[in-house]
A protein has these predicted regions:
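Extreme N-terminus nucleophile/cap motif
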Residues: 1-53, 67
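Flexible, charged surface loops at secondary-structure boundaries
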Residues: 24-25, 59-63, 88-91
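GIY-YIG nuclease catalytic motif and its immediate N-terminal context
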Residues: 56-62, 78-79, 83
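Regulatory input/activation interfaces that engage signals or partners
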Residues: 60, 64-65, 69-75
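Acidic loop->beta-strand submotif enriched in PP2C/PPM serine/threonine phosphatases
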Residues: 75-94
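Short, acidic, Ser/Thr-enriched surface-loop or helix-capping motifs
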Residues: 97
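Active-site glycine/GP-rich loop and adjacent strand/helix microenvironment
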Residues: 100
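Short histidine
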Residues: 103-106
């Protein structure tokens, strides 16, 4: 099952977490947040390099940001960037992460 984590502003995540999670959830990584100007920032990759994941996340790993993070464990669908979270629902307005399979959408 995928892992979704919400990092509150008051929490700093340890680098070791990224190393541990990638052992089981290695089929995609992504995160989303609002920057200080209230712009939506997203990042996603299918790289299996946990240090790359942490390095992309590190600038937001402080008390200024609440961050939604998703580590994918593939159950269906290809291991491609398009199947990696967060998903854009409405550009620059709505992004989502979910657990499980959603099918039949157009």
């Amino acid at each position: 099952m995928c892992l979704i984590l919400l990092k509150p502003k008051s929490v700093i995540l340890p680098k070791k977490l990224f190393k541990n999670v990638i052992e089981k959830n290695k089929n995609g990584f992504g995160f989303m947040l609002l920057d200080k100007q209230k712009n939506i920032i997203t990042y996603k990759t299918i790289s299996k390099n946990w240090e790359e994941h942490y390095d992309a996340f590190a600038p937001y790993n402080n008390n200024d940001y609440e961050v939604g993070i998703h580590w994918r464990l593939k159950t269906q669908g290809d291991e491609i960037l398009e199947n990696t979270h967060p998903f854009e629902v409405k550009k620059d307005e709505i992004y989502m992460m979910h657990n499980g399979t959603i099918s039949g959408l157009q």
